[in-house]
Amino acid sequence: MSESGHSQPGMYGQGRRRRRRRDRDVGPPGQNLSGPSRDREYVPRERRDGSEEPPGPLLQKTPIILAKPPGERSKPSQSVPIGGGQALEKPIMLIKSREDGGKPGTPPEVASPCSGASKLEREGQRPTQPVYQIQNRGMGAAASSGAVDPVIGQTKLVPPEKMKHSIKLVDDQMNWCDSAMEYLRDQTDMLVVGVIGLQGTGKSTIMSLLSANAPEEDQRGYVFRAQTQEIKERGGNQSTGIDFYITQERVIFLDTQPILSPSILDHLINNDRKLPPEYNLPHTYVEMQSLQITAFLFTVCHVVIVIQDWFTDINLYRFLQTAEMLKPSTPSASHDSTGSSGNEEGSEYYPHIVFLQNKSSRDEFCPRNLKKMHMAVDKLMAHSHLKYKGTLSMLDCNIFPGLDRDYLETEVNMFLLPLMENEGEDALTKAGSGSAPLFSLLPGYRGHPTFSSQVSKLRSQILAMSRCQLSHTILTEKNWFHYAARIWDGVKKSSALSEYSRLQA
């Protein structure tokens, strides 16, 4: 026992020499001369001397691993922090990566703590500043081109796409078209302006000038195509159905085919076009088409412009009263539109009516004649529920600076536009042809403002009109489109219009 060296444990002072001696004993544990009782004596001593063990197999840092964010537990590249100083740097890295994680070009090493920060925010920590993302047609192109805000790292909002020309809302066969849906958005701040008028009064030209074009531009580039010289010479019409155009300021313009058009009637008669079974005569079908379009505009528009090129046609006012009578009722929130005439006048919607006298002469701008025109229109529309007065005034435009506000006692929504012509040619033709060179340079007397200034004042007054609620619920642009499609379907199936057509035949 004394030769084996295990009889006296105190002789081996340090555990290191004891380990070297054990490494040389390669025999099985049963052959140890000290016995199993002596083997159990130094095991507790080995555990008490833990500083000599290698750091690999120890798991004393396990609580630090459990305290790490869940997004970093599965990362094999990160090691367990040993010192206390490195563990304090982790929250600082998380805060910085949350601010810079959304920027393009962030390396994956920095973007990974951002996911942990976003999870912390979902667990209860609120973000310091909300981020709103509005999806539109131009967002993808802006994001691909790199239009990124340097402060918050988000794609900048781009303006709505500008339409280059009008598109069809109702085609020449009186069928509804869905192509306008892609230009509409989910917002409620919109204004719908429609126009009706006889053939050749300048409806498409006026709507183009109010929406997107200027008088000095080429008419071939207008958003609503105007009559060409060839069409004017053969007495034809340019517009068919209903054309749609929306500006970037979210103003919807609806241009229509001429009402009671003789060219459309001539086309039906000469081309042997088959009429619908409910109409027997071509002129009845043309009149019912005009009534359907007008009744539709009275239901879905905030402002309806009635254009004339002379004052005045009494049949036009009779037509307006008939369309008002056959206008579909405002549908409630509980049921769809049936296209029948409404019974409750208090809940019915009626738009603003603007009587636009296009191609006005110098005599019509005379204050005395202007007063007579207002009195005549007021008497003709006295029994109408349409809002034909109180929302537009030529006296507010400083066109007649010498007239008092009370001069037009029965002022209606009437506006006068002079003949559209080149101002330079107008000055040369109307200038004095005397021998004195001074008079030859002076412009001729017009008796009214220029055409461009009148169009600008008309646009300002129309865009400033009140935007009443079209239905019992607030409509967005897309909701208005579906609402208009439902109204158009109700107008075509209207029992009141069918009964009126039967009585006309």
From Swiss-Prot:
The protein's name: Nonsense-mediated mRNA decay factor SMG9
Keyword list, A-Z: Nonsense-mediated mRNA decay
Similarity remark: Belongs to the SMG9 family.
Top-level lineage group: Eukaryota
Stretch list, region Disordered: 1-127
Lineage: Eukaryota, Metazoa, Chordata, Craniata, Vertebrata
GO BP term, example: nuclear-transcribed mRNA catabolic process, nonsense-mediated decay
Function: Involved in nonsense-mediated decay (NMD) of mRNAs containing premature stop codons. Is recruited by release factors to stalled ribosomes together with smg1 and smg8 (forming the SMG1C protein kinase complex) and, in the SMG1C complex, is required for the efficient association between smg1 and smg8.
UniProt key word Ribonucleoprotein: no
Biased composition (Basic and acidic residues): 37-51
Subunit annotation: Component of the SMG1C complex composed of smg1, smg8 and smg9.
